[in-house]
């Protein structure tokens, strides 16, 4: 069975954040992470991603992905580094 959209976003975003965890947190890092997430999601789910918004803070990372399916689907995700938790859900 194919995973849910929430699970796909969680795995992709968590892995890309982990890959860039020790980089300097600046605009270039945020743009690089945005480009990587966009590339992977567009590869896995072609022509389904409408927009991606990513916000990085020193202790957390947040993403909102809008999928343009028959009815609009929005996935929101939060990763907290201190507690090592990730929460992703459809809103």
Swiss-Prot record:
What is this protein's record name?
Uncharacterized 10.1 kDa protein in cd-pseT intergenic region
Which top-level group of life is the source organism from? Answer: Viruses
- Its source organism is Enterobacteria phage T4 (Bacteriophage T4)
Give the matching Pfam families.
DUF7355
């Amino acid at each position: 069975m194919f995973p849910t959209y929430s699970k796909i976003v969680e795995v992709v975003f968590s892995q890309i954040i982990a890959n860039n965890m020790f980089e300097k947190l600046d605009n270039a890092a945020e743009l690089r992470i945005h480009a990587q997430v966009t590339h992977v999601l567009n590869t896995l789910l072609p022509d389904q991603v409408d927009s991606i918004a990513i916000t990085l803070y020193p202790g957390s990372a947040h993403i909102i992905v809008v999928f343009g399916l028959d009815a609009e689907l929005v996935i929101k995700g939060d990763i907290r580094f201190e507690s090592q938790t990730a929460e992703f859900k459809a809103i």
